[in-house]
Amino acid sequence: MGSEAIGALGLGLLLVLMILRVPVALTMLIVGVVGFAQIISWDAAVAQLKTVPVEVLSNYSFSAVPMFILMGVLAAHSGMAGKLFDSTRIICGGWKGGLAIAAVGSCGIFSAISGSSLATASTMTRVALPEMERYGYNRGLATGALAAGGTLGIMIPPSIALLIYAILTQQSVGDMFMAGLIPGLLGLVMYSLTITVVMYLRPSLAVAGEPTAWKEKLLSLTGLVPFLGVFLVMILGIYFGAFTPTEGASVGAFATLIYALVKGMRGAQLWHSVQETLALSAVVFFMLVGAETLGYFISVSRISFSITDMLYGMDLTPIVVVLCILALYFVLGMFMDSIAMLVITVPVVYPIIQAMGIDPVWFGILTVLTVELGLMTPPVGMNVFVIKAMAPHVGLGEIFKGVAPFVVSDLLRLTLLILFPVLSTFFLL
């Protein structure tokens, strides 16, 4: 049997194991080791199994992962999220639908230091949903805004998804973060406009909150200082070369730790944050070990090159290839976790993108945005299920219905990024 056929069988086995709910990291590890052994030898596969974990764990760039996770966990447990929503509520709450806009804005700002969509969605739901329910907001609108706002964490830097894509494709982490800045902020603006349009079409879904004076609005900006301070120090430091993205992650984590200690985080809370960080980091690293092992198998099977040759034979233009891959990501996103989808598929599709001369940074932004859509779409929609767990009294169908306008908004944003690549590459020019 040829190596390409073994590669195709391996990908089929990968799909079967995932359908059987075998953990994604273990699935990639099994397929990678067995496939590599079939093409090369069992001795080589065992030797690889010994070296790959060391390669991953000793990779300097990967050390940014636990730092970004720690930063988000500390922000979630230190009370920063509550103060953040209080500030945005005072600024926007007097508008019709203003609390939903405040929730989306809070999600965008919180995600700037959490790096995780699920952490952003769960934290801000705990803080913002009770307030929106108190004012009689339609539950679909309220939870839909939070589910959509949570997805901003996967794009606005620092983003764990962008970091993993950069490492898997050997791109500059700093370039990926800079490329995600405008698309992330564009998402924040478009979500706010979506709420405004929904309120215009269906004004009964929400009411205006209590109006506040301009002096109070200006004073409330102090609640944004910790977030903007940490975010700007990291992003500007990375952009101007003061430190690497990995060092920037450590700077951000240290600054967040200082804030948490000043605000009274002590002993048990701090230890719980460290434990949560270690648990989440272990999951990510196990997946990366599996992805690296799978990547070696895909490389020796040469299946990516076979797919590339087939595409060349079909005489498809690069943009058509990109659209086909994004359509595949959109479908996969309905069933798979976002990080799992990246680590499984990027080793397969990246050689194709590279061979066709497509900008890998631009493609990475499109990929992550399409993955972001999967966090909101049924049947899986991880953000939706996180919010359902936080608000069991709200029906799942109600949340998915509330998310629908934001899915349309994201499709429009994806279209803009495809038509105008400069939106992704502006800070790289």
What are these model-predicted stretches?
Residues 1-429:
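Alpha-helical transmembrane segments of multi-pass membrane transport proteins
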